[in-house]
Amino acid sequence: MKHFNLLSIILVIVLATSYIDAFTRNDFPEDFLFGAGTSAYQWEGAANEDGRTPSVWDTTSHCYNGSNGDIACDGYHKYKEDVKLMAEMGLESFRFSISWSRLIPNGRGRINPKGLLFYKNLIKELRSHGIEPHVTLYHYDLPQSLEDEYGGWINHKIIEDFTAFADVCFREFGEDVKLWTTINEATIFAFAFYGKDVRYGNCTTGNYCMETYIAGHNMLLAHASASNLYKLKYKSKQRGSIGLSIFALGLTPYTNSKDDEIATQRAKAFLYGWMLKPLVFGDYPDEMKRTLGSRLPVFSEEESEQVKGSSDFVGIIHYTTVYVTNQPAPYIFPSSTNKDFFTDMGAYIISTGNSSSFVFDAVPWGLEGVLQHIKHRYNNPPIYILENGSPMKHDSMLQDTPRVEYIQAYIGAVLNAIKSGSDTRGYFVWSLIDLFEVQVGYKSSFGMYYVNFSDPGRKRSPKLSASWYTGFLNGTIDVASQDMTQLQRNFSGSSSL
């Protein structure tokens, strides 16, 4: 018989109900940013146009599950239409990434003028509508040429090439970009794409027991190198901020046993501390060093000093919360994910409810717990919630009520965390529109706008969530008093596929 952690049950009840308290956009700090996001490969399309060369994501998606981002949402050609949707919504910031292989097709050296022009035009269009660009430099899409040449992130050479790429971006776009994320969810990228069963960029197997941690180490060094370059060369004039983002599940013990409590602390060390402890204190968590031994790379004294303090903010990617136990449990992540990483972690993950590839349970207290943990453990750094959203099957109705309920609950959690002292400065819904998704292709989607992927024109249609977010941002929706039935009725009369 399962014995639930009583404290966790109480927290679920108390914290979940607390989010129904009335709040509006005006309850957040004036400089808090509400936005939405996409990434280059998932949004742009135009994979073979205007000088772009293949990235490892092209290679992986073409050989993995048959669907790909060759056209995706065709954002490359439809960016003005999408910016207009953002402006109509009242979006304050738009998070997007720059395709390395579109801007610098060979990975280093020559800049592609058409790629450069596209991003300059996109940023100009955003600025002309009063929308703050938040630019991610790396969202999984390493130029395939660098993977073929030296193995990408498992080779120390990546640090120099990534820094040179970042230098081009800072120089060309930095006057109009004040928020930079170097690497998207570095944790899950390292353990998910360097696993035993799926190999990133070349679809072959490798030494996954070592490469996960080598890749993570090189990401930290590359981030620090780019960050230090920015601060030395550009920050005094451009006055921007630069950070790194991590994948942060909410983590809570499955039972009230001491073993599950300890397993949860180990999981937090591996999933949060792997990146955050070096960024804040200059070294890896003791739990990782004890467990991994020589498999965990070591920072030199100089590297430690470079990494420490290299993030002006921490980006958080959060979708749901899981239980953690010390006892063997069914594996809930996709079969392609690196199971050996979780074996190293010495903790088993259990879903809190009905979460799947097509739906996430809304567990807003889990996000609040993540923010409170980072506040207490890592000196309360500035935080941006860079991805938070709920997937649904792509052919679902436009009335995506579960997504609306999910988003408003998590926004309430962020507000609670801010009131408790968390220095959280922004919240970005994932995603603005339906995208190509890395694990499931076009089977499920996160978008607030529906995209008809069967239509060559990739027609966009607003979902209920777009209507709700618009109302929240322009101040016409009070979360506690909002009549969901009336919102659905108004919406159903104005939108169709």
Curated annotation (Swiss-Prot):
The active site is at E185, E387. One of its GO terms (biological process) is carbohydrate metabolic process. Pfam families: Glyco_hydro_1. GO terms for molecular function: beta-glucosidase activity. Residues 1-22 form the signal peptide. Keywords: Glycoprotein, Glycosidase, Hydrolase, Signal. The keyword Hydrolase applies. It catalyses: Hydrolysis of terminal, non-reducing beta-D-glucosyl residues with release of beta-D-glucose. SUPFAM superfamilies: (Trans)glycosidases. GO terms for cellular component: peroxisome; plant-type vacuole; secretory vesicle. A beta-D-glucoside binds at Q42, H139, N184, E185, Y319, E387, W430, F446. Its EC number is 3.2.1.21. Glycans are attached at N65, N202, N354, N452, N474, N490. Belongs to the glycosyl hydrolase 1 family. This is Beta-glucosidase 8. It comes from Arabidopsis thaliana (Mouse-ear cress).
